[in-house]
Amino acid sequence: MIDTHDITGLILAGGRGSRMGGVDKGLQNFRGLPLALHTLMRLQPQVGDVMINANRNLAAYESFGVPVWPDGLADYAGPLAGFLTGLERCETPWLLTVPCDTPLFPPDLAARLAQAATREGADIAMAAAPEADERDGTVRVRTQPVFCLLRVTLLESLVRFTQGGGRKIDRWTEQHACAVVAFDQPGDDPHAFYNANTLAELHALEGLGHR
């Protein structure tokens, strides 16, 4: 069994924000708070500790009261660079990654991923959620690879993968035992994994379910 205090949460806020015009996405306003702070408040009850991965405006993120660490890899290398930073700094057996731009993520995310990892003896547990295909509207359950519960012993594997030039999450996670948890049950918020890539999408998210 994985206890809450066995998990450190990592908020991924280190991206370029290119589709938002290059702004620091985690500091954009959502319901009166910076996105990353809203994410922090949603994540804190689910885990033992929290830290933030950011590459700009570090003092602003530090004002939220948790440790802030930039990427160790150069040139905005993507979410795996954040994973790597988190695993290097994590002092608990498990690390839970959450992006800063998906503010409605489930309040039981950590618990359900931890249950699946325990049940399946997996090194990774990854969220999945229903998504409508843009071409034909068909709803399929798709993995959400930035929502990952990772065993910290995976650090060495990720170092090797990134040193070899690997940058895609799924190419790395497929090398390990990975449990996939579908958040498509009755009572699950259908908007839980909606993310904001543009300011218009962020404003649209503000009007969705308050959970």
From Swiss-Prot:
Enzyme class: transferase
Required co-factors: Mg(2+)
GO biological process, one term: bis(molybdopterin guanine dinucleotide)molybdenum biosynthetic process
Pfam families: NTP_transf_3 (PF12804)
UniProt subcellular location: Cytoplasm
Listed EC numbers: 2.7.7.77
Binding site for Mg(2+): D101
Catalytic activity of the protein: Mo-molybdopterin + GTP + H(+) = Mo-molybdopterin guanine dinucleotide + diphosphate
Self-association and partners: Monomer.
Family the UniProt entry places it in: Belongs to the MobA family.
Biological role: Transfers a GMP moiety from GTP to Mo-molybdopterin (Mo-MPT) cofactor (Moco or molybdenum cofactor) to form Mo-molybdopterin guanine dinucleotide (Mo-MGD) cofactor.
Protein name: Molybdenum cofactor guanylyltransferase
Gene name linked to the record: mobA
